[in-house]
Amino acid sequence: MQPIFSIITVVFNGEAYIEGTIQSVVNQTYPHVEYLIIDGASKDKTVEIVKKYAEKYPIRWISERDKGLYDAMNKGLKMATGDFVLFLNAGDRLISGDTLEKIAACVTPHTDILYGETMLVDEKYHQIGTRSELTVQKLPEKLMWQSMKNGMVVCHQSFLPHRKLTPQYLQGNLAADIDWVIKCLQSAENITNTHTVISEYLMGGVSKKQHQQSLKDRYAILKKHFGFLPNIFNHLYIVWRAFWFKLWNKKTY
């Protein structure tokens, strides 16, 4: 099969990082790619950089004010026409030029979701290690919506649901990505582990900078999906796990 991948990049004032993200997409060896860039009316040179690449490559883009990250991501979903959707926001990158080719080789007529590993990188794009190696969140061999009971076990940048399964994002919740992934998984029947590192994730982001609020939002999302009492016990485990992880001198990203 030769599925079309809709890659969506959301950016606001991202002149320092957007070019590397764009290059990782337009330099893919796999040809069936729809690339969408959603800019939130940046005031720096972001739009100038986007225009430069849009003149050379088939990039569809908009630049307008939005109501935040997830509003912009919803705009991207509405614009997408491909088979599978991947959010690769400014600063994140596909890890190699043949990444989409490897993923496409895993697709069957019945595939609903594809997923894989994520490489963590610093601001100089030095690879730190995979998310499974360096954090408490280990990528499951078999991913199900129940796998999310203790948090985000798969990185957004390495998760490709079929477009027909994708709901709109919640607004005003920093853990809306968890809710979105759970809903996609709940709607899926055939979920494929690609057994490959898909993306490079630049450390930082909204949820990192507003950590306390993101934890509260995560609690509310998981309570909605798993119930009050199970969520209490799950979060006791989350706290216990984080404590022991820190005790062994590892950084929790």
Spans of model-derived segments:
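N-proximal low-complexity "stem/linker" segments adjacent to membrane-targeting elements
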Residues: M1-N27
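Cell-envelope/extracellular polymer assembly enzymes that use nucleotide-activated donors
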Residues: P3-S6, E34, D179
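A conserved acidic beta->alpha catalytic loop
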Residues: P31, D39-E48, N89
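Glycine-rich, basic loop-to-helix element that forms the pyrophosphate-binding segment
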Residues: S63-A80
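Short aromatic/hydrophobic "clamp" motif used to bind/position activated sugar donors
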Residues: V85
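Conserved donor NDP-sugar-binding/catalytic core segment of glycosyltransferases
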Residues: G97-T130
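Conserved nucleotide-sugar donor-binding catalytic segment
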Residues: T130, T135-S214
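Catalytic core of nucleotide-sugar-dependent glycosyltransferases
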Residues: E189, K208-I232
